C-alpha cells in the first residue's frame, strides 16, 4: 500500500518537476550540515566567503589524503611487539641425549671389517707416499701390501686418489690401489671456485675422492680435500652410510647403545627416574637417542623452581672404547633441549657434553610468538607448506629443519632414485646403497653442493610462528674429582648397578654428569600484537575528520543524502527536459504557430 | 555590496547608498564580525560557534548554571590543552618490532689468533735480557730455581752484549719489594738496593683489596723523569701479577721498536696455524684466510673477511655446513712469561667490524673439539631525536683510526689514542697509529710509561671525556654463540688421526703431532632464522593530528574550523572592534572640541540596541548583516533547521524587498 502511495508521489513529482533548485539544495545543506566549514561559506561576506570556501575545500582534501595514509597504514598489517621476562612454572624442555658414535664398534665390527681393512691400507699408502718421488707411480709391492687379501669391491665404487700437483699444469692423479696412472684427462673439479684454487703452491699432494657416474658416459668428478684426514673421514662416512643403509631398522637399533648401558642415573628434582622414563628414538646420525619428557604418551613435566636442585641430573656412560675409530673422531655425549613433541635435530641445535666432566646447563626459554598471516609470513602448523613432512612418522610437530630435510630427501629421490640414509624415507622408496644404486654417491655429492636445490628448499619452507630457542648457559667442571677415593666411590656403585659386576668397567673417559635446570629468569617472551586494529583505524579516521572539519559518520550520511537529492533533481530535470523535447518535436511538425480556432474554422469553411 | 566610492561621500548630503545603510542599520540586527561592541561579538560567537560549551553559557538561565557552564567549558579547554601537550611530548617515542626471517644468511667473518703472539724461538734474541731478569726476579722472590745456579749475572755482562738501552731501562723501572708500606721503604729485587719511595700514590689494589702482610707486597714505581718527586707506585697483592704486569710493560717497549715486517715474520703463518679447513662441505685452505696483524696477538687470520669482494653465505644450518678447522698451536714455542694459557682465540664478527679480539674473544682449548653454534640477530635503533646514537659515526668528533666501520669501542680506543698522542707525544702500542705519530718507546720518550699510566687512570675514571663524546652506533649485528666442548680426538681414533694430520703437516715439520698442540673448531649456524629487532617511530604526523582531532572532538566537538574561528573572532574581529571604537571616540572628541555644542549620541550604538530588540532576532541563530541581505531565514523560526526546507520560501522575495525598494535601485547604479 505504502509502496504504491510512494510510487504515486514519485510519479507526481516527476510530472511536476523538482520543487527546488540545485542552489537551494546546496545552500540548505551548507546551512544545516554538522560539518563546520560549509556553514561559514554561506554566512559570510564575499571575501570571507571565498576564504572559507577555499579553507573548506583544503580541509576536505586534507582529510581525504590523511585517510588514505591511515588506510594504507592499516593494510600494511604492522605489528607491535611486547617483551616479558620473568620466572613462571613452565614445561621442562624435552632433553634428548645421544652418543656421538651411532653404534657400538663391538657389534658392527663384522659389517665394517672389510671397510676398516681397506681404510687401514689406504692410510698406509697415503703415509708412504710422503717420502716417495711423487711423479712415479706407487708400486704395488706385493710382498708388503695386503691388497691381495683386500676386497677391492668397496674401493672401486668410491676410490680415493692422490693428486700430485708438483706440476700445476699437468696434475697427476694416482689411484691409491691401482698402478694405472691417468693424466690430466679428467679435470679435478670442485663446485666452489671461491674456495679451491687448483694451482696450489702450499700443498704439492692432495687426497681427493673420485666420484663417478656410471649411468651415462663415464663422468667423474674429484672432490678435493686440503687435508688427508678430512678426506679419509668423508670417504669413510660415505662408505659406511652405504653399508648401514642395507640393514633393517630393528637390527640397527640392536647395534646401538642400549638405554640401560648409557643412562646410569637420573634424578628429576627430588624424584628418582631411570632409563625407563626416556623415550627411545632412532636417530640416523647418532644411533639410539633417548628423550626425557618428550610429552608423547604422558603429560609433560613442569618445573616450578629455578636452580640446579630442581632440574634434571643425569649420569651417562658413553663407553669411548667402543667407538668406531674412523667414523667419529669426536667423543662425547650429544644433547639437545627442545620442545615437547618435536623432533631433535642434533646436528643443528645440539651441543656436546664432554666425558670426565660435569656439565651444568642453565636454561632460559626464549620464545617468539608471532601472528600468522597476514601479519608475518610464517606457518602455524606446517599444513600450508608445499613440502610433505617426512618426520610425521615420528608423530612430531612441524619445524623448519624437518621441512628442509624432507625437501632434500624429496629431491634426492627425484634425482638419484633413492633416499639418503640420514633422512626418513618417503613411501615406496629405499635407502641408497652402493650395490643397488652405484651412482648414488656421485649424485648425492652433486646435489649436496648445488646451490639451486638448496635455494629451492629455502623458498618452499616457512618458519614456524612460535619460535622457541633454549638459551643455555653452559659451565663445566672436572668430574669425578681426581681424589681417587671419590672416583672409586663413584665408579664401583655405578658399575655394579649396571653390570652387577665388581670389576669397574667405567672410567673417566666414559662417564658424564649433566645438570639441566631453569635459570632464575626462565622465560623471555616476545609476543606480537597487531599495531593497527580496526578500532584504531576508526578512531584515527574519526580523529582526522573531527580535527579538520568537526565531522562524523553522520555527516558523511548527510552528504550522501544530498547527493541522492541531487541525483533526484537531475532525474526529474532530465525527465522534464525529455518531456519538453517531445513536446517541442511534436510542435516542430508544424513549423508555424498552432492555428487558432478562427483559423481552423476558416480552413474548415474554405474547404 | 556598495561600491567603495560611496563611503567617501557619506560626510555630505546623503548619498543614496548612505541612506540605505542607515536604513538597514536601523532595521537589521547588527551582530557578528560587524558587531559594535566586543560583548556583542562574544555573544554572537557563542551563539554561532560550532563548539559545544560556549552556546550553553549564553543560553542557560540562572547565574549558577551559567557559572557551571563557564567552569565546564574552561576545564574542557584546559583538558584539551593538557592532553595535546602530552601528545606532543610523547611524539618522539619508538616502538620495537621483532621480525624473523628464514633465509640464506651471510656467514660472519671469523678471526682466529694463536694466544701466543710470536714464536718464542724467533723472539728470544729480543727478549733474552728481559727474560733473564724476570727469571732472576722469580728466584729472588720465591726461591725458585730452574736447576741453574742462583748467581746473578752482573750488569757488565749485559752491556757487553751491546744492548745498553734495554738494561738501562730495566734498571730504571725495577721490580720492588716493599718492606714496609708505612715507612715507605722498598728493596730492589734485582740489585738488592734499599730505597725510599717518594711517590704518594698507591695504585692497583691498595684501596680495594686488603693486602695481607705488607712484607709480601711487590710492585714497581713509575716516576716523572723531570720531577723525580712525582711518582706513582703500583703494588700488587700477588707477585705473579706484579711480574706479569712488569713484564708486559717492558715487552711493549721492546716490541714498539721492532718494525712491522719483522714482527709479521716472527709470528705464525697461516700454514702454521691451520691444519685442515672445511666450509660448507668443501675444502678450504690458508688462501681463504686474510692475514691481519694484531699488536697484542701477533698474526691473526680472518676467514671470510670479504676482502676479495665475495662474502660466503650459508644456506643450510647445522655443524656439517659451517666452518670446521683444526688449528695447530705450537705449545712448545710459547713465551713462558707473557702468556700462561694455551690455545687459540677466536672472534665472530661482521666483515666491516674491527675484531677486538683482546676484549671479546672466545678462547679455544687444545685437544678438544669446540663447537660453536650461532644465532644471528640484527638490530637497528632510531637515531636523533629518538635516541642518542650515531648512524655512521661521521658526527662524532673523534677520528676513526681503524680502517673499519664505526663502533663504540673503536671510538673509545681512538679517543684514548688521540689523548695519548696529545699528552705524551707518542702512540700506545696496542692501538693503531694516528697519522704523523709513532709508537712510544723508551729511547725517544723516556717518560711515556708514567704518562700512559696516568692517562689510562684518567680514562678509566671518565675524566678524559671520551665516554661522553663517543656514542653507540645505531645498528649492529650480533652473533649469539653457544659453545660446547667435546673430547677430540677420541681415544680410539687418536692414533690414526694424529698420523694423518702429521702427514698433512709434513711440508712444515717432520714430526709426529701431539694432540695437545691441536684444537678442533666448528663454527656453524644453528638455524637460518635472522632476528631483526628494529625501532620504528610510534607516531607520525597523521596519527598525531588524528589524536588531536579525537581530543578536540571529545571535549568540545571542536575542529580546525573552530580554531580558525577563534582566531578570527578573538583576534581579528575583536581587535578591529576595539580599534573602531577608539577611532569613533577620537572622532567624537575631535568633533566635540571643534563644536562644543551637545550633539546627538553617536549613531552607531543606537541601531545595535535596536537590533537586539528587533523582533526579527528572536531566533537564536541570528542572521548576520550579510546573510540577512542574501539569504533570509524562513520566518517560522521556532524550528529553524529541522524539516527539509520549504524550498519555495527560499526565493529572494524575502522580508526586505518591500521595505527597501531603494536597495535595488542603489545597487543598480
From Swiss-Prot, chain A:
<dbReference type="GO" id="GO:0006883">
    <property type="term" value="P:intracellular sodium ion homeostasis"/>
</dbReference>
<dbReference type="GO" id="GO:0009897">
    <property type="term" value="C:external side of plasma membrane"/>
</dbReference>
<dbReference type="GO" id="GO:0035264">
    <property type="term" value="P:multicellular organism growth"/>
</dbReference>
<dbReference type="GO" id="GO:0035725">
    <property type="term" value="P:sodium ion transmembrane transport"/>
</dbReference>
<feature type="topological domain" description="Extracellular">
    <location>
        <begin position="72"/>
        <end position="551"/>
    </location>
</feature>
<dbReference type="InterPro" id="IPR004724">
    <property type="entry name" value="ENaC_chordates"/>
</dbReference>
<dbReference type="GO" id="GO:0015280">
    <property type="term" value="F:ligand-gated sodium channel activity"/>
</dbReference>
<keyword id="KW-0813">Transport</keyword>
<dbReference type="Pfam" id="PF00858">
    <property type="entry name" value="ASC"/>
</dbReference>
<keyword id="KW-1133">Transmembrane helix</keyword>
<feature type="disulfide bond">
    <location>
        <begin position="407"/>
        <end position="457"/>
    </location>
</feature>
<dbReference type="GO" id="GO:0034706">
    <property type="term" value="C:sodium channel complex"/>
</dbReference>
<keyword id="KW-0915">Sodium</keyword>
<keyword id="KW-0968">Cytoplasmic vesicle</keyword>
<dbReference type="GO" id="GO:0003014">
    <property type="term" value="P:renal system process"/>
</dbReference>
<dbReference type="GO" id="GO:0050891">
    <property type="term" value="P:multicellular organismal-level water homeostasis"/>
</dbReference>
<dbReference type="GO" id="GO:0014824">
    <property type="term" value="P:artery smooth muscle contraction"/>
</dbReference>
<keyword id="KW-1015">Disulfide bond</keyword>
<dbReference type="GO" id="GO:0002283">
    <property type="term" value="P:neutrophil activation involved in immune response"/>
</dbReference>
<feature type="transmembrane region" description="Helical; Name=1">
    <location>
        <begin position="51"/>
        <end position="71"/>
    </location>
</feature>
<keyword id="KW-0406">Ion transport</keyword>
<comment type="function">
    <text>This is one of the three pore-forming subunits of the heterotrimeric epithelial sodium channel (ENaC), a critical regulator of sodium balance and fluid homeostasis. ENaC operates in epithelial tissues, where it mediates the electrodiffusion of sodium ions from extracellular fluid through the apical membrane of cells, with water following osmotically. It plays a key role in maintaining sodium homeostasis through electrogenic sodium reabsorption in the kidneys. Additionally, ENaC is essential for airway surface liquid homeostasis, which is crucial for proper mucus clearance.</text>
</comment>
Swiss-Prot record, chain B:
<feature type="disulfide bond">
    <location>
        <begin position="223"/>
        <end position="231"/>
    </location>
</feature>
<feature type="disulfide bond">
    <location>
        <begin position="277"/>
        <end position="284"/>
    </location>
</feature>
<dbReference type="GO" id="GO:1904045">
    <property type="term" value="P:cellular response to aldosterone"/>
</dbReference>
<dbReference type="GO" id="GO:0009897">
    <property type="term" value="C:external side of plasma membrane"/>
</dbReference>
<keyword id="KW-0915">Sodium</keyword>
<feature type="disulfide bond">
    <location>
        <begin position="424"/>
        <end position="451"/>
    </location>
</feature>
<keyword id="KW-0472">Membrane</keyword>
<dbReference type="InterPro" id="IPR020903">
    <property type="entry name" value="ENaC_CS"/>
</dbReference>
<feature type="transmembrane region" description="Helical; Name=2">
    <location>
        <begin position="552"/>
        <end position="572"/>
    </location>
</feature>
<dbReference type="GO" id="GO:0005654">
    <property type="term" value="C:nucleoplasm"/>
</dbReference>
<dbReference type="GO" id="GO:0098719">
    <property type="term" value="P:sodium ion import across plasma membrane"/>
</dbReference>
<feature type="topological domain" description="Extracellular">
    <location>
        <begin position="89"/>
        <end position="551"/>
    </location>
</feature>
<dbReference type="GO" id="GO:0006883">
    <property type="term" value="P:intracellular sodium ion homeostasis"/>
</dbReference>
<feature type="disulfide bond">
    <location>
        <begin position="389"/>
        <end position="474"/>
    </location>
</feature>
<dbReference type="GO" id="GO:0070062">
    <property type="term" value="C:extracellular exosome"/>
</dbReference>
<dbReference type="GO" id="GO:0035725">
    <property type="term" value="P:sodium ion transmembrane transport"/>
</dbReference>
<feature type="topological domain" description="Cytoplasmic">
    <location>
        <begin position="573"/>
        <end position="669"/>
    </location>
</feature>
<dbReference type="InterPro" id="IPR004724">
    <property type="entry name" value="ENaC_chordates"/>
</dbReference>
<feature type="disulfide bond">
    <location>
        <begin position="426"/>
        <end position="440"/>
    </location>
</feature>
<keyword id="KW-1133">Transmembrane helix</keyword>
<dbReference type="GO" id="GO:0050891">
    <property type="term" value="P:multicellular organismal-level water homeostasis"/>
</dbReference>
<comment type="function">
    <text>This is one of the three pore-forming subunits of the heterotrimeric epithelial sodium channel (ENaC), a critical regulator of sodium balance and fluid homeostasis. ENaC operates in epithelial tissues, where it mediates the electrodiffusion of sodium ions from extracellular fluid through the apical membrane of cells, with water following osmotically.</text>
</comment>
Amino acid at each position: 500500500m505504502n509502496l504504491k502511495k510512494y510510487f504515486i508521489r514519485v510519479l507526481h513529482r516527476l510530472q511536476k518537476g523538482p520543487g527546488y533548485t540545485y542552489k537551494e539544495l546546496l545552500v540548505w545543506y551548507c546551512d544545516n550540515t554538522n560539518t563546520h566549514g560549509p556553514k561559514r561559506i554561506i554566512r559570510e561576506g564575499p571575501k570571507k566567503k571565498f576564504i572559507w570556501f577555499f579553507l573548506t575545500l583544503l580541509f576536505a582534501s586534507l582529510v581525504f589524503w590523511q585517510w588514505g595514509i591511515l588506510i594504507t597504514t592499516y593494510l600494511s598489517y604492522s605489528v607491535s611487539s611486547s617483551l616479558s621476562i620473568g620466572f613462571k612454572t613452565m614445561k621442562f624442555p624435552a632433553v634428548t641425549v645421544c652418543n656421538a658414535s651411532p653404534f657400538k664398534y663391538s657389534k658392527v665390527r663384522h659389517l665394517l671389517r672389510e671397510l676398516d681393512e681397506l681404510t687401514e691400507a689406504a692410510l698406509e699408502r697415503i703415509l708412504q707416499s710422503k717420502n716417495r718421488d711423487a711423479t712415479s707411480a706407487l708400486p704395488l709391492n706385493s710382498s708388503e701390501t695386503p691388497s691381495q687379501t683386500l676386497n677391492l669391491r668397496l674401493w672401486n665404487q668410491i676410490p680415493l686418489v692422490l693428486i700430485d700437483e708438483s706440476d700445476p699444469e699437468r696434475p697427476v692423479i694416482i689411484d691409491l690401489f691401482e698402478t694405472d696412472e691417468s693424466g690430466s684427462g679428467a679435470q679435478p673439479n670442485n663446485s666452489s671456485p671461491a674456495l679451491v684454487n687448483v694451482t696450489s703452491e702450499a700443498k704439492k699432494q692432495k687426497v681427493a675422492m673420485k666420484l663417478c657416474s656410471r649411468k651415462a658416459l663415464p663422468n667423474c668428478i674429484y672432490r678435493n680435500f686440503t687435508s688427508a684426514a678430512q678426506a679419509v673421514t668423508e670417504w669413510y662416512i660415505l662408505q659406511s652410510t652405504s653399508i648401514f643403509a642395507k640393514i633393517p631398522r630393528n637390527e640397527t637399533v640392536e647395534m646401538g647403545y642400549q638405554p640401560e648401558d648409557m643412562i646410569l642415573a637420573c634424578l628429576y628434582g627430588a624424584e628418582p627416574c631411570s632409563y625407563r622414563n626416556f623415550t627411545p628414538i632412532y636417530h640416523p646420525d647418532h644411533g639410539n637417542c633417548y628423550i626425557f619428557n618428550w610429552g608423547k604418551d604422558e603429560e609433560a613435566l613442569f618445573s616450578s623452581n629455578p636452580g640446579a636442585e630442581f632440574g634434571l641430573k643425569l649420569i651417562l656412560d658413553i663407553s669411548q672404547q667402543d667407538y668406531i675409530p674412523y667414523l667419529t673422531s669426536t667423543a662425547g655425549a650429544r644433547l639437545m633441549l627442545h620442545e615437547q613433541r618435536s623432533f631433535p635435530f642434533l646436528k643443528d641445535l645440539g651441543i656436546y657434553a664432554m666425558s670426565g666432566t660435569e656439565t651444568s646447563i642453565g636454561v632460559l626459554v626464549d620464545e617468539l610468538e608471532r601472528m600468522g598471516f597476514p601479519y608475518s609470513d610464517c606457518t602455524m602448523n606446517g599444513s600450508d607448506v608445499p613440502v610433505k613432512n617426512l618426520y610425521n612418522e615420528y608423530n612430531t610437530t612441524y619445524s623448519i629443519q624437518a621441512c628442509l630435510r624432507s625437501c632434500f630427501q624429496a629431491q634426492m629421490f627425484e634425482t638419484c632414485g633413492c633416499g639418503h640414509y640420514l633422512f626418513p624415507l618417503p613411501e615406496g622408496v629405499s635407502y641408497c646403497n652402493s650395490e643397488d644404486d652405484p651412482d648414488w654417491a656421485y649424485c648425492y655429492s652433486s646435489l649436496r653442493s648445488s646451490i639451486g636445490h638448496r635455494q629451492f628448499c629455502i623458498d618452499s619452507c616457512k618458519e614456524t610462528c612460535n619460535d622457541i630457542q633454549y638459551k643455555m648457559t653452559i659451565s663445566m667442571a672436572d668430574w669425578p674429582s681426581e681424589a681417587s677415593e671419590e672416583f672409586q666411590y663413584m665408579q664401583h656403585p655405578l658399575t655394579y648397578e649396571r653390570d652387577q659386576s665388581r670389576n669397574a668397567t667405567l672410567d673417566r673417559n666414559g662417564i658424564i654428569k649433566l645438570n639441566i635446570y631453569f635459570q632464575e629468569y626462565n622465560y623471555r617472551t616476545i609476543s606480537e600484537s597487531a599495531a593497527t586494529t580496526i578500532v584504531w583505524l576508526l578512531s584515527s579516521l574519526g580523529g582526522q575528520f573531527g580535527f579538520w572539519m568537526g565531522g562524523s559518520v553522520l555527516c558523511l550520511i548527510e552528504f550522501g543524502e544530498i547527493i541522492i537529492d541531487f541525483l533526484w533533481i537531475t532525474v526529474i530535470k532530465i525527465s522534464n527536459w525529455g518531456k519538453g523535447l517531445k513536446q517541442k518535436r511534436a510542435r516542430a511538425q508544424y513549423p508555424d504557430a498552432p492555428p487558432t480556432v478562427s483559423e481552423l474554422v476558416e480552413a474548415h469553411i474554405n474547404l | 555590496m556598495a561600491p567603495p566610492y560611496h563611503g567617501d561621500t557619506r560626510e555630505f548630503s546623503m548619498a543614496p547608498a548612505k541612506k540605505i545603510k542607515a536604513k538597514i542599520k536601523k532595521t537589521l540586527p547588527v551582530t557578528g564580525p560587524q558587531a559594535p561592541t566586543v560583548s556583542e561579538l562574544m555573544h554572537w560567537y557563542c551563539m554561532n560557534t560550532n563548539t559545544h560549551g560556549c552556546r550553553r553559557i549564553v543560553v542557560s538561565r540562572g547565574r549558577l548554571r551559567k557559572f557551571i557552564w563557564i567552569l565546564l567549558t574552561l576545564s574542557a579547554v584546559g583538558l584539551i590543552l593538557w592532553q595535546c601537550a602530552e601528545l606532543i611530548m610523547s611524539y618522539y617515542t619508538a616502538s620495537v618490532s621483532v621480525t624473523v626471517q628464514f633465509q640464506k644468511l651471510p656467514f660472519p667473518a671469523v678471526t682466529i689468533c694463536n694466544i701466543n703472539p710470536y714464536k718464542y724461538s724467533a723472539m728470544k734474541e729480543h727478549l733474552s735480557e728481559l727474560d733473564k731478569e724476570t727469571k732472576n726476579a722469580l728466584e729472588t722472590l720465591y726461591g725458585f730455581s730452574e736447576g741453574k745456579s742462583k748467581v746473578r749475572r752482573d750488569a757488565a755482562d749485559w752491556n757487553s752484549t751491546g744492548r745498553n738501552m734495554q738494561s738501562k731501562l730495566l734498571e730504571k723501572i725495577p721490580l720492588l719489594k716493599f718492606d714496609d708500606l708505612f715507612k715507605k721503604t722498598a728493596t730492589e729485587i734485582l740489585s738488592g738496593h734499599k730505597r725510599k719511595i717518594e711517590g704518594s700514590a698507591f695504585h692497583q689494589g691498595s684501596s680495594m683489596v686488603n693486602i695481607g702482610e705488607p712484607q709480601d707486597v711487590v710492585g714497581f714505581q713509575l716516576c716523572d723523569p723531570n720531577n723525580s718527586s712525582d711518582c706513582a707506585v703500583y703494588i700488587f697483592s700477588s707477585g705473579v701479577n706484579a711480574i706479569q704486569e712488569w713484564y708486559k710493560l717492558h715487552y711493549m717497549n721492546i716490541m714498539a721498536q721492532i718494525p712491522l715486517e719483522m714482527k709479521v715474520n716472527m709470528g705464525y703463518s697461516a700454514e702454521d696455524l691451520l691444519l685442515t679447513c672445511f666450509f660448507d662441505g668443501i675444502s678450504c685452505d690458508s688462501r681463504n684466510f686474510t692475514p691481519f696483524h694484531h699488536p697484542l696477538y701477533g698474526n691473526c687470520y680472518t676467514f671470510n673477511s670479504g676482502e676479495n669482494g665475495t662474502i660466503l653465505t650459508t644456506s643450510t644450518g647445522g655443524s656439517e655446513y659451517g666452518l670446521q678447522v683444526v688449528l695447530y698451536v705450537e705449545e712448545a714455542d710459547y713465551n713462558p712469561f707473557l702468556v700462561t694459557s694455551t690455545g687459540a682465540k677466536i672472534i665472530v664478527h661482521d666483515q666491516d667490524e674491527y675484531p677486538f679480539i683482546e676484549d671479546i674473544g672466545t678462547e679455544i682449548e687444545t685437544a678438544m673439539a669446540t663447537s660453536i653454534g650461532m644465532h644471528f640477530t640484527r638490530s637497528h635503533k632510531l637515531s636523533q631525536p629518538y635516541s642518542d646514537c650515531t648512524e655512521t659515526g661521521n658526527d662524532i668528533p673523534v677520528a676513526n683510526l681503524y680502517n673499519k666501520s664505526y663502533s663504540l669501542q673503536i671510538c673509545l680506543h681512538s679517543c684514548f689514542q688521540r689523548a695519548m698522542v696529545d699528552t705524551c707525544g707518542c702512540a700506545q702500542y696496542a692501538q693503531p697509529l694516528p697519522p704523523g705519530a709513532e709508537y712510544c718507546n723508551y729511547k725517544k720518550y723516556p717518560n711515556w710509561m708514567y704518562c700512559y699510566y696516568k692517562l689510562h687512570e684518567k680514562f678509566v675514571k671518565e675524566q678524559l671525556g671520551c665516554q661522553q663524546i663517543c656514542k653507540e652506533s645505531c645498528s649492529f649485528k650480533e652473533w649469539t654463540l653457544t659453545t660446547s666442548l667435546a673430547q677430540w680426538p677420541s681415544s680410539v681414533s687418536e692414533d690414526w688421526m694424529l698420523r694423518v694430520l702429521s702427514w698433512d703437516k709434513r711440508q712444515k715439520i717432520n714430526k709426529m703431532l701431539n694432540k695437545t698442540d691441536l684444537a678442533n673448531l666448528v663454527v656453524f649456524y644453528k638455524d637460518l632464522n635472522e632476528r631483526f629487532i628494529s625501532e620504528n617511530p610510534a607516531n607520525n604526523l597523521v596519527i598525531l593530528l588524528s589524536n588531536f582531532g579525537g581530543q578536540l572532538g571529545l571535549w568540545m566537538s571542536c575542529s580546525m574550523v573552530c580554531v580558525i574561528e577563534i582566531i578570527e573572532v578573538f583576534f581579528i574581529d575583536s581587535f578591529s572592534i576595539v580599534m573602531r571604537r577608539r577611532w569613533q571616540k577620537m572622532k567624537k572628541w575631535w568633533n566635540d572640541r571643534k563644536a562644543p555644542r551637545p550633539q546627538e549620541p553617536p549613531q552607531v550604538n543606537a541601531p545595535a540596541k535596536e537590533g537586539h530588540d528587533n523582533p526579527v532576532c528572536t531566533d537564536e541563530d541570528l542572521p548576520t548583516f550579510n546573510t540577512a541581505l542574501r539569504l533570509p531565514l524562513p520566518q517560522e523560526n521556532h524550528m529553524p533547521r529541522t524539516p527539509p526546507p520549504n524550498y519555495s520560501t527560499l526565493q529572494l522575495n524575502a522580508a526586505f524587498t518591500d521595505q527597501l525598494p531603494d536597495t535595488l535601485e542603489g545597487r543598480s547604479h
